[in-house]
Amino acid sequence: MMNPLIIKLGGVLLDSEEALERLFTALVNYRESHQRPLIIVHGGGCVVDELMKQLNLPVKKKNGLRVTPADQIDIITGALAGTANKTLLAWAKKHHIASVGLYLGDGDSVKVTQLDEELGHVGLAQPGSPKLINTLLEGGFLPVVSSIGVTEEGQLMNVNADQAATALAATLGADLILLSDVSGILDGKGQRIAEMTAAKAEQLIDQGIITDGMIVKVNAALDAARTLGRPVDIASWRHAEQLPALFNGTPIGTRILA
């Protein structure tokens, strides 16, 4: 079996039918012409935000990470492992792709510990066991994995989806693409940066060009490139016609170098 490709989905993608249609059409085309196994890892911040708004609950972030109090983890689990995950499975079904919905704790695929007490139920993901997901891939299934994990003590944790995808890529020896709303990392003039090293990222963070959630994304990608020992791509789902090329290894966004 070829080494798998993990596609991490994020941003408002889950809110846009047009975007999901484009993405799944690209996935179908890619799967028809390549034997390479694919895995989707997703967050769903927009789904969570919408739910929190309906429930009149505050959304608090610290350094770009969502603070998850004990009384909110059940709601966030429902939004990510429930609504967001099943929405993606429904789209896969519509496109005749045999898929299976999972969370990080299934088959101990990704191990999770609490990241920081101040953040509450927010987890740090580390590589786990490849057994379950490899079994599914060998059976021709598309695993769709939410970024909810569980600690050894049985505590549910909300994990940053970029970081969850990195840990799963390390578990499986997979390549990783981080798909988001932006077409890559932009410089101070709004131009896409084709390649990024750790030194360059540090410089842009110091200059205030990379800020907030993008710092988390860039650090996750740098961490992924270092952990995996290979480049990681940050790209946009908006250019559907370019996605098959991206899945084939052609950079269309920003390539993060190890």
From Swiss-Prot:
Subunit: Homodimer.
Binding site for ATP: D181, V182, S183, G184, I185, L186, I209, I210, T211
Keyword annotations of the record: Amino-acid biosynthesis, Arginine biosynthesis, ATP-binding, Cytoplasm, Kinase, Nucleotide-binding, Transferase
GO function term, MF aspect, one: acetylglutamate kinase activity
Pathway: Amino-acid biosynthesis; L-arginine biosynthesis; N(2)-acetyl-L-ornithine from L-glutamate: step 2/4
Main function: Catalyzes the ATP-dependent phosphorylation of N-acetyl-L-glutamate.
Chief place of localization: cytoplasm
Keyword Protein biosynthesis: no
One protein family per Pfam: AA_kinase
Family listed: Belongs to the acetylglutamate kinase family. ArgB subfamily.
Localization terms from the record: Cytoplasm
Identification of the protein by name: Acetylglutamate kinase
GO biological process: arginine biosynthetic process via ornithine; L-arginine biosynthetic process
InterPro entries registered for this protein in UniProt: AceGlu_kinase-like_sf, AcgluKinase_fam, ArgB, Asp/Glu/Uridylate_kinase, NAGK-NC
Domain of life: Bacteria
Enzyme class label: transferase
GO cellular component: cytoplasm
EC number: 2.7.2.8
Residues that bind substrate: G44, G45, R66, N158
